[in-house]
Design a protein with these regions (language model features):
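Aliphatic-rich helix starts adjacent to a transmembrane/signal segment
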Residues: 1-31
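Short, glycine/small-hydrophobic-rich surface segments
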Residues: 14, 30-61
Length: 184
């Protein structure tokens, strides 16, 4: 039938569209995290930080601040600004956005809330640029400095999407703070 002819390859097209849209969404959210006035020139508004997840040992995750929150966040009450967000890929669960507002009374005690951005993200990888060697390296985890004291912020984030037999790699360039007028 005509429906079968036109429907061939639907899964792959829908999966690819979903993967591209999640990648673009994440790029936009990270871009809003580096806009003035919340991000100042020379600051690192996107950085690796230790996050306490559900009373477990803290994990070092890529973390950023969304001054106005995000449309994906489902608040128990009125939405709050200054939302600290972290990204984590979990086996069988996908890409998780961990978030809570700095204005919450138990910000330091309570673990962050969780929202699934995409169930099809099978992993995160981090791209680092070595200016001395003029080369890129892709790491499966956030990289430590040579002395091991700090965790380095990558220049790019790779999203590894997987659905059935389909694979897609989304690349998000991590923006840096820029000088300019605040967004009104």
């Amino acid at each position: 039938s005509m429906g079968e002819l036109w429907g061939r390859g639907n899964d792959s097209r829908l999966f690819e569209a979903h993967s591209r849209n999640v990648t673009n969404f994440l790029q936009d959210e990270l871009r809003s995290a580096v806009l003035p006035p919340s991000a100042k020139v020379g600051d690192t508004p996107i950085s690796a930080q230790e996050i306490k997840i559900n009373n477990a040992n803290p994990e070092t995750l890529l973390t950023f601040l969304l001054p106005e929150g995000s449309r994906l966040l489902s608040w128990p009450g009125a939405p709050l600004p200054e939302v600290v967000c972290s990204l984590q890929a979990r086996d069988g669960e996908g890409l998780i956005l961990l978030w809570h507002s700095r204005l919450e009374t138990k910000f330091n005690e309570d673990p962050p809330r969780e929202t699934v951005i995409s169930p099809y993200v099978a992993g995160l990888e981090y791209d680092y640029y070595d200016a001395n060697l003029s080369t890129w390296s892709t790491e499966p985890a956030l990289k430590k400095s040579t002395d091991g004291a700090t965790t380095l912020t990558p220049q790019r984030l790779r999203l590894k999407f997987k659905y059935a037999t389909y694979d897609y790699d989304g690349v998000v360039a991590l923006p840096t703070s820029m000088q300019g007028l605040p967004r009104y």
